Amino acid sequence: MDPVIVLASNNAGKLTELRAILTEAIPSLAPEQIVDAATVNAPDVVEDGVTFEANALKKATQTAQATGLIAVADDSGLAVDVMHGAPGIFSARWAGKHGDDQANMDLLLAQLSDIDAAHRGASFVCAAAFATPDGATRHVEIGKLTGD
């Protein structure tokens, strides 16, 4: 069965989640028709947007154009109120090295150490984007989970 949708990511967890969501929403879609970027040799997309929305839409659009498949992409991170939305799009590399969750968390907590707990509100923000290969359809949605 040929791929129909490509996830603009090589994250196995995201692929599993996307397959579950889409095959439930679209019963005619088989799980193996949803593939990750590496499976179809999609190039890495530079995330140089200044918002979650811009990065997600860029990844979806470029991946769809490169593969000829419908593409889904996301960009997400933590937005701390007292830090005016930082670390934001830099969440995964806040401490310098991309993907070092412990270092990112340690640095963020150190930066907030003199802030009273009552003023440590934050949100997890996720932008999910969809694009068709011809560029005619592009859409992005934002989800936000607020905590304190």
Give each language-model segment a name.
Residues 2-6, 12-35, 39-148:
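Anionic-ligand binding patches
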